[in-house]
Amino acid sequence: MNKDNKVIQLDQSFSKSGGEGQVTLIKNSQALYGKETVAKEYFKTPDQDKKAKISYMTSVDATSLLDVTAWPIDAIFEKQSKQLVGYIMPYTGAREPIHNLYTPTSRMKHFPRANWKFLLFVAVNVARAFSKVHKAGHLIGDVNHSNILVGTDSKVVLIDTDSFQVRAPKKTYLCDVGVKDYLPPELFGKNLKQVVRSQNHDNFSLSIILFQILFLGRHPFMGRMTTGEDVSLEAAVERLLYAFSSNARGNHVQPPPPHMSFQSTDLPRYVSDLFERSFSKKCLTSGRPSASEWATSLDKLRRELVECTSNSNHHHAKGMSCAFCRLDQERIKKNRSPIFGTPTKGKSGGLLRRAPQKKRPIRAPQKVSPLQGTTPLALSQLAPEAEFHNLSGVIGPETYVERLKQSGGAALAVLVAVGLLDSGAVFLGLLGPAAWLGMATIQRVKSLGWAPQHAAWMLLPGVNVGLAIYLAMAKRKM
């Protein structure tokens, strides 16, 4: 029952277990609260301090926080003993933990239309959510990537609010838990049950979350020591070995190489400088960027984003090069999916989905008059399932050649395909500069239908300016 002695009807068909308790949808929430709500029932009877904290949180006007937090709006009492056993909070809807935005695989599964512009929207919303909590006089405290939920609308909700540090008129209810990956180093080794946290502590944790959003899951202290020393992530945080710092070499640490990771130099200075301040030893006591400062700067970056001229699914700051073209080139070499999926045609509008790839039937080569022991092939016969990866996605050979014809006159001059005795194929391409820039790799060629003793080749028209040679090996699965 709730504090008004009204019976709470639980819908056991929608129930999830957490670390502290069970969260269940309330059947009669519309009648009781006029909106969808859930009940969190503790596995263990909470202590007196926790009960007092929940009682206070449910008694204050938290209207300004309800759109960004799962703030308790009512308490749950056991019917017989009248003991507080949990609380009621707004239902957050279909949202995912923020870490599901970090990697291409989890993004494609949970946020298939997300690109970096979307991630920037999320980062702004995270900073604004922190700012609202801070303005209300409270702190998140236990910041980690599991208690920040994100929807496909980019809106953010902070959960586990009963662990917040809550300021009441006569008492401050502390946050006695924390995750070391996000805990500021000045709190390492401290008894959190006795620590009154400050906004500067929250600001450190917020900066790590924002870094992971923008850097696609990278932790700011996950670098490599140039001295060969083996340093754990926890030790790196404690020593403030910020791997992406402009002074990283002075600390004998370096980030992953540019072809493998987003870099601080891929951000405008007014953003990268905030990370420098966040993870600087000078800011151990004060001076880390506030949540509102982060929100302002990230929103400025969001408004200054431009769409990449080579890939409609990539975005970058105005006047800067596209980091994701650089990263995708390396991923394609390793036969891995693009960071943000295949671009769609036209403008992105901030959210794109992976364009479905049409499977075309394999066609046998036409029989034509042999030429010097070879069988010439028409373009339509040339690897109907070959995938040409360029900066604008995966295209077929016909589309690729058409794009080359429009690329400024320097087009593909000669394409020679040689059948091998082991059923594989080698493509040797002589490319003009525009063609060379346009194509990242030929991913695979299969089922060409060539006899092993034959070679197939074709001359394509075009002006060849400055030849470059590209060799790709494609093994056909038997």
Protein language model regions, located:
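Conserved end of the kinase activation segment
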Residues: 187-200
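ATP-binding glycine-rich phosphate-binding loop
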Residues: 1-34, 40, 48, 66-67
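Catalytic-loop of the protein kinase fold
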Residues: 130, 134-153
